[in-house]
Amino acid sequence: MSASAVGSVPRQLTSYVFLLAARLVGIFILPAQVPGDPVGLIEELFTAPLATVRSWPSALVRQLLLQLVRLEKFTLPEDSQLVRLHTMRQRYLAAGWEATSVTTPDAVVLDALLRPPPAALAEPRFVLFVGGNFQKYEDWLPYFDAYARAAGVGFLAFNFRGVGRSEGAVCCAADMLTDVHACIDALLARGVRPAHLCVHGFSIGGAVSALALASRQQPGVAFVSDRSLRSLPHTIYGMVRGLPPSGALEAAAPRADDNGGGADDGEGVVMMHGRWVRPGLRAAALRRAECWVRGAAAAIAGAAVRALGWELPAEAGWAARIPGPKLVLYHRADNVVHYEAASLHLALKDAGDVGDVQEVEVRRLGHRGWGPHDFPLVADEVAWKALIARVRETLGVPDS
C-alpha cells in the first residue's frame, strides 16, 4: 500500500465520523426522518427514556443502529404512519392532485404531490411549499389544497429526503438545500417561468429556502418566509434559554404577612443550611441558577450546531440578496422561533434590510391544538387574505 493510500485512511475515517455526527444532529433538526410517530416518541423519551428504549425489540434497535452508521434512511418493518399518510395521499389523488417525484443531482428520489394549475391560465404558475422539521406533506394537504384554490395556481408539495416515502437520509444542511434546488429545477423544467414561481418556506423550511435562493441568485422567483428563523443557533438559544422565568422578581421581593405588615416577626421564613431564609428568595435563586444552566446549554448546543455545519444562517443568506419579490410572515408570540431571540423578521428590521420586503404579522394564538408557530395560515383570516392577495399579485394571476 502506498504512503498516500495509507494517509488517506485517517482522513476518510475523520470525514465519516464528522458526517455521522452531523447526521445525528440532523435527526434532531429534522425529526420527521424518524419513522412512526416522532412526536409521540420524543414525548416518551423525555418522560421515561430508559423505559422507552428498553421496550424496543433488540432486533429493531440493531436495525436502526445499522441504518444510522450506514447513513441510510430509517425504516420500520411495519410503519402504521406510512399507511395513514398513504390514505391521506390517495384522497387527494382522487380530487385532482397528481403523484410525482423529484430526482436530485445525487440521485435521491423525493416523494411529491402536485396540483396542476388551472387550465384557464395561459402560462403555468406554481407555489412550491418547503415544510418544517416535523412536517410530512400528506398531513398538510387540506391546507395546501385550500392554498392552491385560493391563489389560483398550481402547487408542489414534497418530503425532504428520508421523510415519509422519500429516499435517502439528511446527513448535512447541504442535503436539504439540494432537495429545494431539485424541486425548483423540476418546476422550471415543466415550463414554469421564474417570475411565475413562488417558494413558500415555513419554519426551518424558510431558512433552507432563503439559503437556496440566495446561493442560486435566480432572478424573478418569489419567496415567502413564513414564521422562519434568522439562524439555527439563535433558535436553539430562544428555545433553551428563553426569557427570564416569569415571577422571578416577584419571588425575590419581601412578602407581606396577612395583616399587611412585613415578615420581620419571623413568619414565612425557614431554617436552611444553618440560617433563616425566605422560601421565596431560595426559589428565585434556583430560577436564576436555572437561567444560567439553560444559557450554558444553549451556548454549547449552538456551538455544536455551527461546528457540524448546521447553522442555517438565513439572515446572512438574505444579506447576500434574494433577487425576487419577498414576503415575510412573522408572529410576535411565536412559541418555537422566539421573536426577540430568533425571528428573521426582527433581524431584518434591526439590520434595516426590509426596504423591499412586504411584511405580514400573524396574530392568531393557535388553532385546534397547534400553537402560534405551527397552525396553517388559513386559520388566521387577516394573514391568510394578505398572503393570498400578495401571491396572486406577485405571480400575475388574473382576477377570475
Where are these regions (language model features)?
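An N-terminal hydrophobic leader/cap segment in hydrolases
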Residues: G7-V102
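Short, surface-exposed "cap/lid" segments of acyl-processing enzymes
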Residues: V109-D111, R115-A150
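Conserved alpha/beta-hydrolase
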Residues: A148-E167
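Alpha/beta-hydrolase active-site loop
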Residues: V170-G191
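Active-site nucleophile loop of the alpha/beta-hydrolase fold
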Residues: V224-T235
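Short alpha-helix in the alpha/beta-hydrolase fold that links the catalytic acid
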Residues: A314-E315, G324, H338-L348
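Short beta-strand/loop motif that positions the catalytic acidic residue
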Residues: R321-P323, V328-Y330, D334
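C-terminal catalytic histidine-bearing segment of alpha/beta-hydrolase fold enzymes
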Residues: V336, E340, G352-S400
